[in-house]
Structures are given as C-alpha cells and as structure tokens.
Amino acid sequence: MATSPKINRREHILQCLAQMLETSPGQRITTAKLAAEVGVSEAALYRHFPSKARMFEGLIEFIEDAILSRLNLIMDEEKDTMMRCQLVLQLLLVFSERNPGISRVLNGDALLGENERLRSRISVLFAKIETQLKQILREKTLREGQGFNLDEAILANLLLAVAEGRIAQFVRSEFKQKPTLHFDEQWTFIQQQLLRS
C-alpha cells in the first residue's frame, strides 16, 4: 500500500501566501482568499497560525534565515572588501528575483495595513544588513590602512539603497524589471567610484 507524503500544512500555507503575493501584485491578501488557495477553511488556517500577522511573521522568519545565513557564509568565505560588498548586494537582488512574492514583504508593499511589528521586523533586518556593510567597509581601513573619503556609514547606506531601489523597481513593475538586470555593469561603476574615494 503506497502512502502519500505527509504535507507540512504550515509550510504549505506559507508557500501559498508567497505565491498569492506574487500572482496578485498590489492586492491585499485576505484569510478567506488564502484559505481557498490552500484548500482549507479559515478555521483550519487559524489552527496553524493564530493570526494573519503570524503568517507574515513566518515568511519574515524564512527571509531572515535565508539572507542572514548566506550573509555569514559570505563573511566566512570572502575576504576582499569590494567582493564582499558586491556579494551582499547580489544576495539581496537574487533572493528577491527568485522569490517575487516575498519581495513584496521585503519592500513593505505587502505589509501595508498589517501589524506595525511586521514592518519593524523588516526594518531591523535591513538595519542588520547595513551594519554588516558598514563593518565590511571599516575592515578595509583596518586591513589595508587606507579608508574612504566618506564615512563608512554613509557608504553602507548608499549601497543598501541601491539594492532596496532595485527591489522596489521589481515590485513596482509587477516583477517584470529584474533586480539583477545590469547589476554587474552598475557594480563595476560603483566600485570604481568607491575605490577613488
């Protein structure tokens, strides 16, 4: 007798939510629509998540785990300052491109009208990434004895703004304008400017 693999209902709900965020850009996702997509009642959704905010927190936890774990790998495996910065930005852009619905969460678009703590959590994630970029840039000064003409905090903010802007364009274009489009050429220019400073 063949047994079908047991579906992890929580993961399935989160996958459906991410899919709906991708296929319904600009629209608010209701628990009724999500329940219909998952194929269960709203009551069944609430057996797995006490609120819609907790569902979004589940997506945010996925985002944090995926991005921060890869960020740690970059820090462990790469020592060159400019390559580290490039890889951090590429990580954000590629992650967004591969997860269009989740890009709406990163961008804040999907969180409009939702619980404030969700937006705060995304803000904290971006603050961690910016802090990491600042640390990467400061280490260049320590290792090479030569820094930048601008404060590392200002440069880190600029670099993160580039990635956030590309993600915003991706969401605004309803996922047509890929965040990685022309990034290599743009990075070459940015790197030249950074190394001149």
From Swiss-Prot:
Name of the protein this chain belongs to: Nucleoid occlusion factor SlmA
Write down the Pfam families for this protein, in alphabetical order: SlmA-like_C, TetR_N
HTH tetR-type domain sequence ranges: 7-67
Q: Which family does it belong to?
A: Belongs to the nucleoid occlusion factor SlmA family.
The alphabetical list of record keywords is: Cell cycle, Cell division, Cytoplasm, DNA-binding
Which function does this protein serve? Required for nucleoid occlusion (NO) phenomenon, which prevents Z-ring formation and cell division over the nucleoid. Acts as a DNA-associated cell division inhibitor that binds simultaneously chromosomal DNA and FtsZ, and disrupts the assembly of FtsZ polymers. SlmA-DNA-binding sequences (SBS) are dispersed on non-Ter regions of the chromosome, preventing FtsZ polymerization at these regions.
Which NCBIfam families does this chain map to?
A: PRK09480.1 (NF007015)
- Molecular-function GO terms, alphabetical: sequence-specific DNA binding
Q: Does the keyword 4Fe-4S apply?
A: no
Known DNA-binding region: 30-49
* One term under GO cellular component: cytoplasm
- Which source organism does the UniProt entry give? Shewanella denitrificans (strain OS217 / ATCC BAA-1090 / DSM 15013)
Record note on quaternary structure: Homodimer. Interacts with FtsZ.
An example GO BP is:
negative regulation of division septum assembly
**Superkingdom of the source species:** Bacteria
Q: Which InterPro entries match?
A: Homeodomain-like_sf, HTH-type_Tx_Regulator, HTH_TetR, NO_SlmA, SlmA-like_C
* Localization, UniProt: Cytoplasm, Nucleoid
UniProt xrefs under HAMAP family:
NO_factor_SlmA
